[in-house]
Amino acid sequence: MGKFFSDSEWTYAPCTYVSENTFVGREPEDAPLPTYEDARDRLPKPVWEGHYDAIACYDKAWQIAFGNLRRPTPGSGFVSNFIDTAFNGCTFMWDSSFILMFGKYGSRVFNFQNTLNNFYSHQHVDGFISREIEEDDGSEKFTRFDPSATGPNVMPWCEWEYYLNIGDRLRIAEIFPPLLAYHKWLHDNHTWQDGTYWTSGLGCG
């Protein structure tokens, strides 16, 4: 499979909302990553008498999560520290969004939500965002018109759930332009004539 990069294709109809995307071209974060050992006492603790195996499983999930934190590779276009999908050296839109559904509960220690920043920073000028991006060089696994290239659009749901828990209005203002541009791209390129959306089996995850 070939490698593709943001805005490397020949023909684009630029989306005006992308010009308001502050993640594109941002300097990468340069902060150390926390370890599970440093974080464990600041993570939520379940209280469930007699279910020690379940609590041990819960603790192990956090240990695995902190073991998969990564920093942006120089030149990759990644802008934020993030949690790795731990599959094939790529970060995935769907996997990341669902990981962040539990990651938000560890936000006092690490801002897991910033993982999605690395998708916004790779937005094309027409609003497209790839669902699978190489972590080492920022290349994308699909051209933007491949039926499996992106979507369905789960990132706004993930961001809204984060807002309901954290109440970060500044983040809502920051993510709105790239999400609106991405929504518009999906509306223009992944809908049938009756207005319903389409994707492929592979594109669903």
What are these regions (language model features)?
Residues 1, 204-205:
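Accessible peptide chain termini
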Residues 1-91, 114:
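Low-complexity, Ser/Thr/Pro/Gly-enriched N-terminal "stalk/linker" regions
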Residues 14, 89-204:
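Aromatic-rich carbohydrate-recognition surfaces in CAZymes
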